[in-house]
Every structure is written in structure tokens, then in C-alpha cells.
Regions:
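Sec-dependent N-terminal signal peptides
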Residues: 10-15
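N-terminal signal peptide c-region/cleavage motif recognized by signal peptidases
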Residues: 20-22
């Protein structure tokens, strides 16, 4: 079966059931999920798929919208710990700064699952599973396409403007790294401007219009 980023979240719910202790089998499983926000149509569909997967699995879902703020996710995770949920899952706003709250979840013996985005922590045992994409490879693929396209006109050089996602998020960091890796050493491909669009249509449009005005 071909897994998309949307139905991988359904798999996350299945994974949650798998990591929960058998003792929970006699009662509905309770999962606390902290979503990044509702910054795009994709994220809205992502949230809908999570809620649908929980309903179909008979899971009691406690849902929290972080509104793209890490501090809101930390508060939500601590609330889930206080409520003694069986599993915590979240799609992290940014990549770093999670060690303390994840240690609290581990101390409470509540397994944590990362969905869509990864984190950087000092101890990998602070979460039990990551279900998501290889964002570095996504960046490489975009760059490979550009490299192949550039070969059609070898006499031309290309100035690149880069529209990034949320500052500090795994997708933004990793896609940039993968893209830069492939174009490194190619003198005909040069990134001249780079700015965040916060993964929103409105901000992305605003930034791209500014790019076109200043560089177009």
C-alpha cells in the first residue's frame, strides 16, 4: 500500500495502540495529541485524518491546537501528563527544546510518538517512534530537478530565491540542508535570497511578491 503523509497519521494511531500496555485493553485508550496549528489546508486535512483515525479505532482523543507556538505544545504535553493519558503524540512546531518535557513524560511512563516532524533530543529514548517524511531527501529531490533542468541551458546561470517554512522546524531545516547539499559546488546555481513563509499561503505569497519586486 502506498503511504502518504496523511494516512501515515492513521498508522500513528495504530502504533499508539501497539506501544500501549496490554493492561489498557479492557478500557478505551486515551491519546493526547498536540497539533502544530491550522496554518494550511494540508494541516487542516491532517487534523481531520487524525480525528477520523481515532474515532475508527475507538480511541479517546484529547486534542490540543498549539497555534504554531512551542510553549503551547509544552503546556499541552504537561496537561496530558497530569491527566494520565495512555499515549502522547505530537507534531512538533520546532525541532529543538523538547528534552525537559519529554523527560517528564518518560518519568510518568507515558510513551511519546512524533508525527510528521522529528525532534533533536539528547536521549533518543525520550520518544518511542517517529512517523513522517525524509525531509532531507525532499530537499535533494527538488535540487536534483533543478540541476537537470539547468543542463538544458548550460550557458545560463540561475539565481535562486528560497521560500522556507517555519523557522527552526524540521521540514524547513532538513529540506534546506538537502537542497544545499545537491547544489553545493555548482557555480551556476546560487541562492541569493532566503526567507520564511511560515508554511502559510498568505505569508508565502507576501514573501514571494517581495522577492519578485526586488529580484525580478
Amino acid at each position: 500500500m502506498r503511504l502518504t503523509r496523511r494516512n501515515l497519521l492513521g498508522a500513528a494511531m495504530a502504533a499508539s495502540l501497539a506501544v500501549a500496555a496490554p493492561a489498557f485493553a479492557a478500557k478505551p485508550l486515551t491519546i493526547g495529541f498536540s497539533q502544530v496549528g491550522a496554518e494550511s489546508e494540508w494541516r487542516t486535512a491532517n487534523t481531520a485524518s487524525i480525528k477520523d483515525a481515532a474515532r475508527k479505532a475507538g480511541v479517546n482523543l484529547k486534542f490540543a491546537d498549539a497555534q504554531q507556538r512551542q510553549e503551547n505544545q509544552v503546556k499541552a504535553i504537561r496537561s496530558f501528563i497530569a491527566q494520565r493519558v495512555d499515549v502522547i503524540a505530537f507534531s512538533p512546531v520546532v525541532e529543538s527544546g523538547w528534552d525537559t518535557v519529554l523527560r517528564e513524560a518518560k518519568a510518568a511512563k507515558i510513551p511519546v510518538i512524533l508525527t510528521d516532524r522529528a525532534v533533536k533530543v539528547s536521549d533518543p529514548s525520550l520518544y518511542v517512534s517517529f512517523i513522517g517524511s525524509d525531509f532531507v531527501e525532499e530537499g535533494r529531490r527538488a535540487a536534483r530537478w533543478l540541476v537537470e533542468h539547468a543542463k538544458k541551458n548550460p550557458a545560463r546561470s540561475y539565481n535562486i530565491v528560497e521560500l522556507q517554512g517555519t523557522v527552526g522546524s524540521a521540514p524547513a531545516l532538513d529540506r534546506k540542508a538537502g537542497f544545499a547539499e545537491v547544489i553545493a559546488g555548482n557555480p551556476k546555481l546560487k541562492i541569493i535570497r532566503s526567507q520564511t513563509g511560515d508554511f502559510t499561503r498568505a505569508k508565502g505569497k507576501e514573501v514571494m511578491e517581495a522577492f519578485l519586486k526586488s529580484e525580478g
